[in-house]
């Protein structure tokens, strides 16, 4: 007997509905509930919880609609039955997201060992990272739709199975090609697992206050994966070699499958829109072709017909994507949202955040190993200031934005991140760690200050019905920036090396470029956020029939399409 997700609840996309924010920070999940409080209001957080209390009252009135599969008269037992499994469900969803986030950072520590054992160049390392991030970025929006249409438990466990099997393939990969293929499959699994885990958690907590607590725990506990990645990667690689960083996922995945099959209840949204297959395919191919040109350009030469052809194909594919999305009734990416200046500015800045953060992080361990001569384990520990700063500062970013406004906090964060990266561009082989760690920490603080307020700005730029969609797009744009960051900064390093410069000089150029772009974005964002206003009110949203309505993509849980 499983709890069905068709009880009365706040409409998806309203201030009380859950918005998918992929970044694993507590305040980002809180900001997703912020609704449409004033852009500069110091009372934004208070307004958020006041709105949730009002919605909770409405939910209480609708609890009579709660049904259980196979026993429509057992409404009175629904809440008690679900509570008995909530601890298990929270553990299962947190562990799944932990795996996804761990793989975002654990690979970086192992890159030097991969390069040595697989006899690959910088280009190969770029593909190892970008193959995973690319698929997560481009399939994340559609993953939530799959979960709503085909069942959240089914999609979650399928994602776990694919991710676990792909991890085994990665650990056994005899060559670079097999490893990249495994990373592609990992990305597909992660894109299904992540939004489905959040949807499962929301469906089990129909009361808004309960959702906030559950999602806060989900975000906080799973976010430990970010901080644990560099250390775990260094320890495992030093002791057993790079395959061990993927083998660590196997016991977690097996446990999740066994427990999930037994204890998770199924839920879905029957009114979810059709999956935008043409848009999804075109988005993956477009970004993939562009990434190919950027990564391989340094090796083949920027004037190579293949590279020039890839850039030309990118333009054609992008035009096709825009044309397809403009004509669909339920597009993966509603282009009309970019008519809001605030939405466009916040997502543009989020691309730069992903670009600079992931692009620079790709080289941190390589700098400590190849330039300063550290061991793989030591290098993993030396990169900790970035992730620790982000984990510590992120919970306060939303509060600062509520008090001082998005413009001040975002501009300050981007400026600090840019200055930190510029400072990293001036370190050398003989620079002591005492003069390096603060540069890493400064960049981490800056990125943490910028990310969740940028998501909040994107949410407030649109109507309440589309708040979840806005947060999902914000997460996707950051991931796209991450793909491009690894590709572009890697191209800078390789181009400098092909011109006779040392690897150290190439790294300095890459860090300086990332810092300059981030500082320029701080100026651009500060100017344009000051002139932007949230979207005006629209018609009241329609009531969803799904109490677990989680807007994870193109309004999968919104009935307004």
Predicted regions and their residues:
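Transmembrane-helix bundle of Major Facilitator Superfamily
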Residues: 73-262, 394-397, 404, 408-429, ...
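Short hydrophobic alpha-helical segments enriched in small aliphatic residues
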Residues: 3, 7, 23, 34, ...
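Intrinsic disorder in cytosolic terminal tails and internal cytosolic loops
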Residues: 48-85, 528-561
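Extreme N-terminal basic, low-complexity initiation segments
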Residues: 1-15
């Amino acid at each position: 007997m499983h709890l069905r997700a068709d009880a009365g609840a706040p409409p998806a996309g309203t201030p009380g509905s859950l918005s998918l924010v992929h970044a694993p920070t507590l305040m980002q999940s809180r900001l997703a509930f912020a609704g449409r409080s004033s852009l500069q209001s110091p009372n934004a957080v208070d307004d958020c919880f006041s709105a949730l209390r009002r919605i909770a009252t409405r939910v209480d009135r609708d609890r009579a609609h709660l049904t259980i599969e196979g026993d429509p008269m057992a409404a009175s037992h629904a809440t008690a039955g679900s509570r008995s499994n909530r601890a298990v469900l929270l553990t299962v969803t947190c562990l799944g997201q932990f795996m996804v986030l761990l793989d975002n950072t654990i690979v970086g520590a192992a890159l030097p060992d991969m390069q040595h054992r697989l006899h690959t160049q910088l280009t190969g390392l770029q593909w190892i990272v970008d193959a995973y991030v690319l698929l997560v970025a481009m399939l994340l929006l559609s993953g939530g739709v799959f979960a709503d249409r085909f069942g959240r438990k089914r999609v979650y466990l399928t994602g776990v199975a694919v991710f676990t099997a792909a991890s085994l393939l990665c650990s056994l990969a005899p060559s670079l090609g097999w490893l990249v293929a495994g990373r592609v499959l990992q990305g597909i699994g992660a894109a299904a697992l992540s939004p489905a885990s959040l949807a499962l958690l929301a469906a089990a907590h129909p009361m808004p206050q309960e959702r906030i607590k559950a999602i806060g725990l989900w975000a906080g506990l799973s976010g430990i994966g970010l901080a644990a990645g560099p250390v775990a990667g260094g320890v495992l690689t030093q002791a057993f070699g790079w395959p061990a960083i993927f083998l660590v996922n196997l016991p977690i995945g097996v446990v999740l499958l066994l427990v999930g099959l037994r204890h998770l209840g199924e839920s879905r949204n029957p009114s979810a829109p059709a999956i935008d297959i043409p848009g999804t395919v075109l988005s993956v191919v477009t970004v993939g072709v562009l990434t190919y040109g950027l990564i391989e350009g340094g090796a083949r030469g920027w004037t190579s017909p293949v590279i020039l052809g890839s850039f030309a194909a990118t333009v054609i594919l992008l035009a096709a994507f825009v044309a397809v999305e403009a004509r669909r009734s339920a597009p993966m990416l509603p282009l009309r949202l970019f008519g809001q200046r605030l939405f466009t500015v916040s997502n543009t800045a989020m691309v730069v955040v992903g670009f600079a953060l992931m692009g620079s992080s790709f080289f941190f361990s390589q700098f400590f190993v190849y330039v300063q001569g550290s061991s793989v384990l030591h290098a993993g520990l030396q990169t900790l200031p970035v992730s620790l700063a982000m984990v510590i500062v992120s919970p306060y970013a939303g509060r600062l934005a509520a008090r001082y406004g998005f413009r001040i906090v975002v501009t300050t964060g981007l400026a600090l991140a840019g200055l930190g990266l510029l400072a990293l561009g001036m370190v050398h082989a003989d620079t002591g760690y005492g003069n390096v760690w603060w540069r890493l920490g400064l960049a981490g603080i800056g990125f943490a200050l910028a990310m969740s307020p940028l998501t909040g700005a994107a949410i407030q730029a649109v109507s309440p019905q589309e708040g979840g969609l806005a947060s999902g797009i914000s997460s996707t744009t950051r991931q796209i920036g991450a793909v491009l960051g690894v590709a572009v900064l890697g191209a800078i390093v390789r181009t400098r090396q092909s011109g006779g410069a040392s690897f150290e000089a190439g790294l300095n150029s890459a860090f300086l470029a990332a810092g300059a772009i981030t500082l320029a974005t701080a100026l651009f964002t500060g100017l344009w956020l000051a002139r932007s206003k949230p979207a005006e009110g629209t018609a009241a949203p329609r009531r969803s029939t799904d109490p677990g309505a989680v807007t994870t993509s193109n309004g999968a849980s919104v009935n307004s399409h």
